[in-house]
């Protein structure tokens, strides 16, 4: 037997492991850092006592739960399609399935919902300001960097996608979805 197939399998496993670690790090860096660590550490989220009779608290818990479920669905979509990264900075393919059929930025939207839920749990002006800064910063990043990079990389397919799928507000999918990657 030639050592080449074993070396090829090892190389593939190493690349897959490396990409998985990178994806996991990105997962921790974006949602974990911005929606988890910062509010927990610097805005007092760790001191919140949820009052089940408080409608604002119930709405906050619902927003966090929806954000977490949507975020999980996004990551599962990437994993299911064996996409090599979860980072928005180097997408290998244009993802238009799953939640991406309805909204172009479901990961950012999910994190925004989670932080909004945290705002509803607390009466913190600092956390409200943080949420507003997060939302503005994400918009600027998406519009000034990510969308431009995706237009350069995917051309007409991305332009068609943008024409039918909202950046932040979900839209009903059209029949055109099947031709976006062509």
Question: Over which residues does each language-model region extend?
Answer:
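Membrane-anchoring alpha-helices and their flanking helix-loop junctions
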Residues: 2-97, 109-182
């Amino acid at each position: 037997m030639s050592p080449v197939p074993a070396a090829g399998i090892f190389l593939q496993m190493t690349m897959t492991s490396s990409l998985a670690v990178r994806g996991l790090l990105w997962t921790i860096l974006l949602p974990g850092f911005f929606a988890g660590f910062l509010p927990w550490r610097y805005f007092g989220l760790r001191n919140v006592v949820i009052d089940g009779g408080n409608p604002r608290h119930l709405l906050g818990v619902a927003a966090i739960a929806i954000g977490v479920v949507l975020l999980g669905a996004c990551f599962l979509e990437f994993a299911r399609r064996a996409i090599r990264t979860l980072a928005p900075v180097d997408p290998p393919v244009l993802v238009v399935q799953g939640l991406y059929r309805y909204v172009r930025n479901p990961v950012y939207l999910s994190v925004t919902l989670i932080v909004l839920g945290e705002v509803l749990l607390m009466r913190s002006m600092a956390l409200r300001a943080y949420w507003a800064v997060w939302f503005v910063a994400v918009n600027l990043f998406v519009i000034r960097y990510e969308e431009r990079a995706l237009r350069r990389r995917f051309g007409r397919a991305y332009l068609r996608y943008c024409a039918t799928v909202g950046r932040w507000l979900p839209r009903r999918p059209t029949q055109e979805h099947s031709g976006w990657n062509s």
